[in-house]
UniProtKB/Swiss-Prot annotation:
The keyword ATP-binding is annotated on this UniProt entry: no
EC number, as in UniProt: 3.6.5.-
Protein known as: GTPase Obg
Keyword Metal-binding: yes
Keywords: Cytoplasm, GTP-binding, Hydrolase, Magnesium, Metal-binding, Nucleotide-binding
Domain Obg intervals: 1-159
UniProt source species: Crocosphaera subtropica (strain ATCC 51142 / BH68)
Signal sequence interval, chain numbering: none
Amino acid sequence: MQFIDRAEIEVEGGKGGDGIVAFRREKYVPAGGPAGGNGGKGGSVVLKAEENLQTLLDFRYARRFKADDGKRGGPNNCTGAMGKDTIVEVPCGTVVYDLETEEILGDLVKNGQTLCVAQGGKGGLGNKHFLSNQNRAPEYALPGLEGEHRNLRLELKLLAEVGIIGLPNAGKSTLIASLSAARPKIADYPFTTLVPNLGVVRKPTGDGTVFADIPGLIAGAHEGIGLGHEFLRHIERTRLLLHLVDVTSADPIADYEVIQQELTAYGRGLSDRPQIIALNKVDACDQDTLDLIAEELQQLSQSEIFTISAVTKTGVEELLQAIWHRLDQATSNHQDSSLPLV
């Protein structure tokens, strides 16, 4: 399935039903008063978070959503039926913007959470409301009001607790495939991963934690170079970043610094996010070189450093134990966190 994480849609609430002009016509009431009912309220357009959706792909084909109009009032002071709401399902993690004002209207994080994005119009008043001492038989009523109209931008930010970052070909997809049931495309060339991959990794307790393999970042990603700019926002919600460094690259230290610079340039607190560094592909590196890389990185970062092989799973269990520990710390420090365990 194609991964789409941005879409623009048009939403419109239903028009309110018209009020009507009517009079009482009982057999023994020769001078019956006004009895025109009010129009029904128009339906609203409501976005609803759905955990089984993973992409905004559907909005490439359906971009306009309108709720039903309210019904006109009836005689005998009967109010018209309300218009039916239009419910539009979106993936959990969808941020909703007003396209004209750039105002954030809502952030749909939890399954079943709803957000009304276009209110239905109010129903018009029937002639019964215009009865007065001066006018005992009003011959007019009000039409229903138009529904609210908006153009929206939807942006999906994945709900993952651990974001796996690193340069292209650092082994991110291999790692997430070895840890979970996710089966991303894996090949020995840069930019194999073109979309984020999600995998659920089980703790010894049986609880699951969502890991996100973010497409490889390169220098200038925050300015739109490469693939990173489109996907940096997907790690905004993470509690922990797992930074993979390929020890077989020409300059692993420079690789690490490139990613750190991109996190800082992107902003939104990403450079301050708790981080664990994993030196990957140790099965293809001699011990002396590995020790030298680890020593240099330790001088640049206060993050824990682990040595692993995503292919042979060497060191992976120790890495996972450290991740669980850091997440438990984050949970105890942020009991109000909205990121769900799966």
